Amino acid sequence: MKRNVSTVIVTLAVAFSAQLLPARSTTISRANTNQSKAFLATETFDGDYREIPKTSIARDGTKIASVKSYKDLHSLLVTLPPDEAMRSKYPGLRKSVKKPNWPAQREPEEIRNVRIKSCWIVSAKHEGGDGDRDFHVVVSNSPTNFSEVMNAEVSGLPKANTADFNTLRDVRALFLTLSTNAPSSSFTHLKPPKHVILEGSLYFDGYHGAGKKNDPGPAWAKPQSVWEIHPIYKLTPLN
């Protein structure tokens, strides 16, 4: 009889403890998520390839270049020079080129700031680990048809407190509020997509190719050009 009573007591104690664990675990998880987002919002750029263009807003001389608006992503894409033409005109943008022969500053075609009045963020990933700390953001002309997409990037912050530091820090923090969880190291499919107005500087990523299996982007929404908006310096959510 004593053994039965002891067994019942132990069973009840284990069951009671198990009921407490999920609530405690959830609290820790939420704290970690918030702490992680706060850390991610202030990460410094840790890449090597063309650091200055990636971490600064396009300028015409000493002034920020004028902004041209486009009604949608398609309207911007049709204005971009073909990848092959850019690599032919600027040999430093070819994939085989090694440092220090990369263009340190923006080429003339990259000195363009653009505003897309309507596009959808459909996927994103974080370049952590050995990456440069950027967020790769795939934007689409449509929330359901991913035939026209482009890579845009929320840059890691400049190493020095430059003129654009606060702007890039603020857009990085805003980007992290668009979903409950921060993007992981692989492309996450955002459901539903985030409808936004997006503003940033054009950038030709000669380091990569486009459209093939190992090129940037998820298989279901893979950009067909290495043209990017990099950095994004303003985001306005529309939904």
Segments predicted by a language model, with ranges:
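Bacterial N-terminal signal peptides
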Residues: 8-19
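Bacterial N-terminal signal peptides that target proteins for export
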Residues: 1-9
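OB-fold and OB-like single-stranded nucleic-acid-recognition modules
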Residues: 24-239
